Amino acid sequence: MTHWIAGEWVQGQGEAFTSLSPYNQEVIWQGNGATAEQVNQAVSAAREAFVDWKKRPFAEREAIVLAFAEKVKENSEKIAEVIAKETGKPIWETRTEAAAMAGKIAISIRAYHDRTGEATREAAGNQIVLRHRPLGVMAVFGPYNFPGHLPNGHIVPALLAGNTVVFKPSEQTPWTGELAMKLWEEVGLPKGVINLVQGAKETGIALADAKGIDGVLFTGSANTGHVLHRQFAGQPGKMLALEMGGNNPMVISDNYGDLDATVYTIIQSAFISAGQRCTCARRLYIPFGDKGDAVITKLVEATRNIRVDRPFAEPAPFMGPQISVAAAKFILDAQANLQSLGGESLIEAKAGEAAFVSPGIIDVTNIAELPDEEYFGPLLQVVRYEGLEKAVELANDTRFGLSAGLVSTDDQEWEYFVDHIRAGIVNRNRQLTGASGDAPFGGPGASGNLRPSAYYAADYCAYPMASMEGQETVLPATLSPGVSL
C-alpha cells in the first residue's frame, strides 16, 4: 500500500512509478501515484481532523511528537539504510540525517513556546494580548536530498501549532516518506492528522490546487518552486513558504591562513552529498597570484583523491552518485555548456556506472556572462579575481541569495564581506553546507520567501491574533461627532 489517508493504508489509483537505487539502478520501491481524487480525500481527512486536533492541549500534541522522536531513535539505523539506498549517500552521512530527524524536534518544541506563545501589554488604556492560532491544513512537499529530516522540519512545527498535514515526498524518495509515516502510525497519531500521498508532478499539482489547503511548505528546486509561486498567484488565501536553491559563492582571500584547512573547507562546501545540498558552493572566487595558485593546485590534487563509491562500501566513500541518471546527465551537460562558452576544465567531471559522476572543477574566469543556474551536483566553477571588492561584486551577480562564504583571517575583510554580500546564510572560515536548526534558513531573491528551520518554522505554522481587551464597557467622556445617546 502506497498512501496513508484518513488513518488507513490505501493503494494508489494513478500512474505506476518506481524508485531506483541511484548506485545500481535496481528497483527498491514501486507503487501507484495518488490521483487528484485521492489527494482531495487526503485533504478532506486533514480538514476533518483539524477540528479536534487544534483543540487538544499543547501537552497532548507534544507528547505524540516526542513519542515519534523516540521511534525515530529506535529505528535510526533502518532509516539511515533506507535513505542511503534511495539517495546513494554514504551510510555515515545518512546516519547523521536520521539523528537530525529526532534531534531537531527539541528545537521545534522550544520554538513553539518562544515564538508562538502569548504576550500581554498595556497601550492607550487597552490590554493588548497577542495569541497565535494554527493556519489549518498544511501541504508539505519534501525534497530528495534530505528526505527524512527536512520534511520533518516542516511537519513537526505544523503539528505542534495545531495544524494538520498532507505530506507529499519527492517521487525520488517515496520509501523514506513511507517509513516515516509508519512511525507516526505506530505512536498512535489520530487519523487524518497526517496524510501521505505519493506521486510525481500530477500529484503535486493536485495537492497545491486543493481547495482545502491553507498553506504550502515547499523545499526543492527553484524551477519547481517558481511554478508553485505562479500557480499561487490566483490563490491569495493560501500561505506559501518556499525554500529553494542557490548559486552560492565562496570567496577565498589572500589572507586565507592554513592552506590545508582552506582546501578541506572548499571540498566540504562543494562536494559533500555529491554536491546535492542547496547550500553547496557553486562558484569559487580565488585571487590572482601565487597564493591563489597554491589553493588551486592543492584543491585539484585533493579533489582527484576524493573517494566516490556506493553508500555501504569499505573503505567509506566521501561521495555517492547523483540522485538519478537524468541528474547525472544534467551535470555533464552543464559542464559541456561551460566548456563551449570558454571554460577550462581543471578536472573534468566524468560519468560512472548508474548515476555516478566524479567531481569536476572548471575555470570560468574568461566567460563574460556566466549562466545563472544552480548546477545541483559536483561541478565547481572557479573565478579568479583581483581585490575583495571585485570578488564581492562578482559574487552578488546572481538572482539567488541562499548562502555565501569568505575564507579570511582578516577581520576588516570579513566586516566588508558581511556588509556587502547578498545572502541569507553567511559563513566565515566554515563550510557553506553547515546549518543550525536555531538559525533562519533561506535567502532573498530566487532562493525563496521565508526562512524555514527547526526554530523559525514556527513563524509560518501559526498566525498572530492581536486582541484589544477591556475588563468592562466604558463610555468615553467625548462622543464622536454625529452620535448622541
Swiss-Prot record:
Binding site for NAD(+): G220, S221, A222, N223, T224, G225
TM region(s), chain numbering: none
Top-rank taxon, per record: Bacteria
Reaction catalysis annotation: N-succinyl-L-glutamate 5-semialdehyde + NAD(+) + H2O = N-succinyl-L-glutamate + NADH + 2 H(+)
E.C. designation(s): 1.2.1.71
Residues at the active site: E243, C278
GO MF entries: succinylglutamate-semialdehyde dehydrogenase activity
UniProt pathway: Amino-acid degradation; L-arginine degradation via AST pathway; L-glutamate and succinate from L-arginine: step 4/5
EC top class named in words: oxidoreductase
Keywords: Arginine metabolism, NAD, Oxidoreductase
GO biological process, one term: arginine catabolic process to glutamate
InterPro entries according to UniProt: Ald_DH/histidinol_DH (IPR016161), Ald_DH_C (IPR016163), Ald_DH_CS_CYS (IPR016160), Ald_DH_CS_GLU (IPR029510), Ald_DH_N (IPR016162), Aldehyde_DH_dom (IPR015590), SuccinylGlu_semiald_DH_AstD (IPR017649)
The protein's role, per its UniProt record: Catalyzes the NAD-dependent reduction of succinylglutamate semialdehyde into succinylglutamate.
NCBIfam families recorded: arg_catab_astD (TIGR03240), PRK09457.1 (NF006992)
Family: Belongs to the aldehyde dehydrogenase family. AstD subfamily.
Stated name of the protein: N-succinylglutamate 5-semialdehyde dehydrogenase
Organism annotation: Vibrio campbellii (strain ATCC BAA-1116)
